[in-house]
C-alpha cells in the first residue's frame, strides 16, 4: 500500500483584500497586468502571452483586454472591491486594459500614468527603414 504524500509548508488560504493596486505594463509587444495589495505583495497577474496569444497578436488591444479580465477575476475572488491603477508604457493595450478592469467589476479610485520619460537620457533605437 502506497504512503500518502504529506505536503510540506504553509498553505495560503483565501485572503480578504478590499483594496489594491493594478499595475498595467503595456509595451509594443505584450501587455502585463499585475495586481498587488497596498504593501506591494502580488495577488494575481496575467499577460497576453499567458492567455494564449503568440507573436504579434500579444501586442493587440484585445489581448490586453483578455489579460486584464483574467487578472481582475482572480483578484475579485480574493475579495478585492476597489483599486488604484498605474499604467506604464506606450503600448496599444493601455486604454483597453483600463476599460476591461472597469467592466470586470473592480472600482477605480486613482488612475496614474507612470511611464518613464527621459530628460534626454539614452539614445533611442534607430528609425526603421521599410
From Swiss-Prot:
It comes from the Eukaryota. PROSITE patterns: RIBOSOMAL_S11. InterPro entries: Ribosomal_uS11, Ribosomal_uS11_bac-type, Ribosomal_uS11_CS, Ribosomal_uS11_sf. It is found in: Plastid, Chloroplast. Pfam families: Ribosomal_S11. One of its GO terms (cellular component) is ribonucleoprotein complex. GO terms for biological process: translation. Keywords: Chloroplast, Plastid, Ribonucleoprotein, Ribosomal protein, RNA-binding, rRNA-binding. One of its GO terms (molecular function) is rRNA binding. HAMAP family: Ribosomal_uS11. Belongs to the universal ribosomal protein uS11 family. This is Small ribosomal subunit protein uS11c. It comes from Chlorokybus atmophyticus.
